[in-house]
Curated annotation (Swiss-Prot):
Its EC number is 7.4.2.4. ATP binds at residues 176-183. The keyword Acetylation applies. HAMAP family: SecA. This is Protein translocase subunit SECA1, chloroplastic. It is a peripheral membrane protein. It comes from the Eukaryota. The modification N-acetylserine is found at residue 73. The gene is SECA1. GO terms for biological process: intracellular protein transport; protein import; protein targeting. Belongs to the SecA family.
Length: 1022
């Protein structure tokens, strides 16, 4: 990182460059040198007039002909591309007639009383149950929701928001700009589709947004008589089940996915929490279906204890040198040992072969090198309380509870000298792609989807529709500024921030990592620029909402890692209502929340003391005595009514939310809090409105990007924070040829340019450079799209198997009688034994009945009456013998069932269910491990001109058939061998009770699983 500039440099000069310095400029491959006096306005104005753009022979007329492409150079191609020709007008025309139908109903609906409005919900439900299509109900349903929103929230959805709702109802992706009210749009189709009674899931990216949306816009469907549920991380299964049964349920993508996997690991019907899927609305759909698509959802169980090998490997990795002992491929995120690396590692470890399967040193050493080179602290992860926490590269948030697999997380822990946690083994997994494709009707909304429309259509069959904005978007996206080295880039970023800050404009600076945001923060501190930092560090995460709420204030400077899913709009002048809520929250929460409540769950240490204190600088003014007294009285009445420190944080937040919204209030305490909130908000608004005028006059919010992301879409998300709802604004990206994206994916062209330029801190402008940078970003997009597509194709193989296994498991879990399933297992197992020991093509005279009988009786001792003569008489043909053995297998099961039921009525049913579920879970877990190894192995077969995917399908299918057969065999064998044992309670318990103990069946809790570990190794006799 470069040294910061002194104040005079910031004010008067380009970073470290004299106004008369020579420039080296590249134009279409030609390096030019020019000496010309530069004015600071031309450098930092709307275009860099000093750089040279050449046409043919420098002809001005030729240059004008090419000006469209050349003027967009400096990498500023983004703004040209993404303003796009489609501004949503075609969508407006497409839905104009339906919007008109909704508007015609407005007068009629607005004349209804509250109770009459609720009755419309019942009438619409009845029409839906009679089979009337949702499309025919849409105009009235949307009109009802619009009116309810006016009454409850004080917000009337615009026509463009109705269009957004119609797009979502149609099962498409609605691209809506930031600030256009996506949260409100979601309740329109959610209400309509909930009328069927089958449930609707509204999916958001984090718990905070799910709770906010449920508490805020969820009031509208609640007002109309629908039940609205919310799923949060720490809820019990009972709470989850209750909330999933609501008409509309707000939930995060990870909670929903993990609940699905947990349901498929449940051992009783009571543990199931989900209902059948019906309709799903995904907020920030690109974040969930594209950014998160590379990371499958995994539920894992503990494996063996961690090994000391991790620490030894970490020491070796730290001693080894790059390009001497190992090479790194940053694009593929892989490392390889060189010949010297192999030899030195084997010598240090005193082993003959690094790849000896008994020691597996190679995987430990390679993971340690990956941890050293590719997984960087404050970029890929942070450390909190001696734990390595992964940072989401797309949102900048900590991914609580997530761990890297295959020993990589342990390698990072060893690198940092932290305690190594247990390794894990996969119990259940699914990709977001295949999970959400289970919904019969799926839709989503985001501010940036059109650039990924091909992926949405090819994988999810979802069309992207651009919804028009309510007011024209007037944000100005400036051309990018490109430097050779990062030093020049960071100097220019500081100058840009300083210049904008002095005009009073609000500035939002986007960085790609925690490390970058901290380094830039240090530069700004040394330059004397007051600012806020929003990244994954815990001290910043806790203040996220308040930081974003003040990001639009006069002269505010905010540094933030990726802004996707932040959920709080940046309002110019500051968000008065949000500030008022924070002030009321600051007073209320410490007095009503239980001191032990919180999300911290640890047996090692007590939870940290919770505080709701807000930095006083956040508020636009000190609260007047009158308003402070009003707030104190309202809080005191709440304490008296609810009790001193008697609520959970979630309950208190919910009541505070009701107090700060515009819906009807019956509760006296909520009414007092509402009055206090409105009074505080009004006082703050007087100041924020004045600030807003000044910020707008100065030019609005200015967004500074410091690096291109792996997708143009994420760049657009950052730009989209400015210019909301017709506000003025601007954006500009500052790039360096040393940025990761260009260094890793740029190829020879960009490397050549880096060698050609000798000045680090002059901006470069060239059509060729722009093309090269844009091509590098396109390469990244295509590369990661290919990864997601490959993951999807491979997971589809697993998905069909997963569906079959989970269907079989659910059948065993919910069936009242498992007899038909067990009979099916018995018959198929007899078929397997017969085929393995005789076979349909074996001549009759070669049939070995002794061998067959031995194997049958090994499985079922109840068939000890079988003799070769009996089989000869019963089975004159292979088919006849098959039918006879099937019948005997079936009869043996029924006989065993009768024996057990006589001993303990109802026990057999519990035993059967337990045996089926435990065998499915155990063998499915082993199957997942086997498929993982197969997937790794087939990758190398491409060198032999064999398609890895086809190889994976074939091998995976064979493994799956064998697993399903093994489940059947294990279950029926265990049932045939099952012997209930009556056991006594502990003598200690007897002495405590002072009474003799009763005899109880060992299966009153879980039946003993006899034979699962000692079943015959095969169905064929030796």
């Amino acid at each position: 990182m470069v040294s910061p500039l002194c104040d005079s440099q910031l004010l008067y000069h380009r970073p470290s460059i004299s106004p008369t310095a020579s420039q080296f400029v590249i134009a279409d491959g030609i390096i030019l040198r020019q000496n010309r006096l530069l004015s600071s306005s031309s450098f930092w104005g709307t275009k860099f007039g000093n750089t040279v753009k050449l046409g043919v022979s420098g002809c001005s007329s030729c240059s004008r002909k090419r000006s469209t492409s050349v003027n967009a150079s400096l990498g500023g191609l983004l703004s040209g591309i993404f303003k796009g020709s489609d501004n949503g007008e075609s969508t407006r025309q497409q839905y104009a007639s339906i919007v008109a139908s909704v508007n015609r109903l407005e007068t009629e609906i607005s004349a209804l009383s509250d109770s009459e409005l609720r009755e419309r919900t019942d009438a619409l439900k009845q029409r839906a149950q009679k089979g009337e299509s949702m499309d025919s109900l849409l105009p009235e349903a949307f009109a009802v929701v619009r009116e309810a929103s006016k009454r409850v929230l004080g917000l009337r959805p615009f026509d463009v928001q109705l269009i957004g709702g119609m797009v979502l109802h149609k099962g498409e992706i609605a691209e809506m700009r930031t600030g256009e009210g996506k949260t409100l749009v979601a309740i329109l189709p959610a209400y309509l589709n909930a009328l069927s009674g089958k449930g609707v899931h509204v999916v958001t990216v984090n718990d905070y947004l799910a709770r906010r949306d449920c508490e805020w816009v969820g009031q509208v469907p609640r007002f109309l008589g629908l039940k609205v549920g919310l799923i949060q991380q720490n809820m019990t299964p009972e709470q989850r089940k209750e909330n999933y049964l609501c008409d509309i349920t707000y939930v995060t993508n990870s909670e929903l996915g993990f609940d699905y996997l947990r349901d498929n690991l449940a051992t009783s019907v009571e543990e199931l929490v989900l209902r059948d899927f019906n309709y799903c609305v995904i907020d920030e759909v690109d974040s969930i279906l594209i950014d998160e698509a590379r990371t499958p959802l995994i539920i894992s169980g503990p494996a063996e204890k961690p090994s000391d090998q991790y620490y030894k490997a970490a020491k070796i990795a730290s001693a080894f040198e790059r390009d001497i002992h190992y090479t790194v491929d940053e694009k593929q995120k892989t490392v390889l040992l060189t010949e010297q690396g192999y030899e030195d590692a084997e010598e240090i470890l005193d082993v003959k072969d690094l790849y000896d399967p008994r020691e597996q040193w190679a995987s430990y050493v390679l993971n340690a090198i990956k941890a050293k080179e590719l997984f960087l602290r404050d970029v890929n992860y942070i450390i909190r309380a001696k734990e390595v926490l992964i940072v989401d590269e797309f949102t900048g948030r900590v991914m609580q509870g997530r761990r890297w697999s295959d020993g990589l997380h342990q390698a990072v822990e060893a690198k940092e000298g932290l305690p190594i946690q247990n390794e894990s083994i996969t119990l259940a997994s699914i990709s977001y792609q295949n999970f959400f494709l289970q919904f019969p009707k799926l839709c989503g909304m985001t501010g940036t989807a059109s650039t990924e429309s091909a992926e949405f259509e090819s994988i999810y069959k979802l069309k992207v529709t651009i919804v028009p904005t309510n007011k024209p978007m007037i944000r100005k996206d400036e051309s990018d500024v490109v430097f050779k080295a990062v030093n020049g880039k960071w100097r220019a970023v500081v100058v840009e921030i300083s210049r904008m800050h002095k005009t009073g404009r609000a500035v939002l600076v986007g960085t790609t990592s925690v490390e970058q945001s901290d380094e830039l923060s240090q530069l700004l501190r040394e330059a004397g620029i007051t600012h806020e930092v929003l990244n994954a560090k815990p001290e910043n995460v806790e203040r996220e909402a308040e930081i974003v709420a003040q990001s639009g204030r006069l002269g505010a400077v905010t540094i933030a890692t990726n802004m996707a899913g932040r959920g709080t709009d940046i309002i110019l002048g500051g968000n008065a209502e949000f500030m008022a809520r924070l002030k009321l929250r600051e007073i209320l929460m410490p007095r009503v929340v239980k001191p032990t409540d919180g999300v911290f769950v640890s047996v090692k240490k007590a939870p940290p003391k919770r505080t709701w204190k807000v930095n006083e600088k956040l508020f636009p003014c000190k609260l007047s005595n009158e308003k402070a007294k009003l707030a104190e009285e309202a809080v005191q009445s709440a304490v008296e009514a609810w009790g001193q420190k008697s609520l959970t944080e979630l309950e208190a937040e919910e009541r505070l939310s009701y107090s700060c919204e515009k819906g009807p209030v019956q509760d006296e305490v909520i009414g007092k809090l509402r009055t206090a909130f409105l009074a505080i908000a009004k006082e703050y608004k007087g100041y924020t409105d004045e600030e807003r005028k000044k910020v707008v006059e100065a030019g609005g919010l200015h967004v500074v990007g410091t690096e291109r992301h792996e997708s143009r879409r994420i760049d657009n998300q950052l730009r989209g924070r400015s210019g909301r709802q017709g506000d003025p604004g601007s954006s500009r990206f500052f790039l360096s040829l040393e940025d990761n994206i260009f260094r890793i994916f740029g190829g020879d062209r960009i490397q050549g340019m880096m060698r050609a330029f000798r000045v680090e801190d002059l901006p470069i402008e060239s059509k060729m450079l722009t093309k090269a940078l844009d091509e590098a970003q396109r390469k990244v997009e295509n590369y990661f799209f290919d990864i997601r597509k490959q993951l999807f194709e491979f997971d589809e193989v697993l998905n069909s198997q997963r569906d079959r296994v989970y269907t079989e498991r659910r059948r065993a879990l919910v069936s009242d009688s498992l007899e038909p399933l067990i009979i099916e297992y018995a018959e198929l197992t007899m078929d397997d034994i017969l085929e393995a020991n005789i076979g349909p093509d074996t001549p009759k005279e070669s049939w070995d009945f002794e061998k067959l009988i031995a194997k049958v009786q090994q499985y079922c001792y109840l068939l000890n009456d079988l003799t070769p003569d009996l089989l000869k008489s019963e089975g004159s043909s292979y088919e006849g013998l098959q039918d006879y053995l099937r019948a005997r297998g079936r009869d043996a099961y029924l006989q065993k069932r009768e024996i057990v039921e006589k001993q303990s009525p109802g026990l057999m049913k519990d035993a059967e269910r337990f045996l089926i579920l435990s065998n499915i879970d155990r063998l499915w877990k082993e199957h997942l491990q086997a498929l993982k190894f197969v997937q790794q192995a087939v990758g190398l077969r491409g060198y032999a001109q064999r398609d890895p995917l086809i190889e994976y399908k074939l091998e995976g299918y064979n493994l799956f058939l064998e697993m399903m057969a093994q489940i059947r065999r294990n279950v029926i064998y265990s049932i045939y061998q099952f012997q209930p044992v009556r056991v006594k309670k502990d003598e200690e318990k007897k002495s405590q009770n002072g009474k003799p103990s009763k005899q109880v069946d060992n299966a009153s809790e879980k039946p003993k699983q006899v034979g699962v570990t000692d079943e015959p190794s095969s169905i064929a006799s030796a």
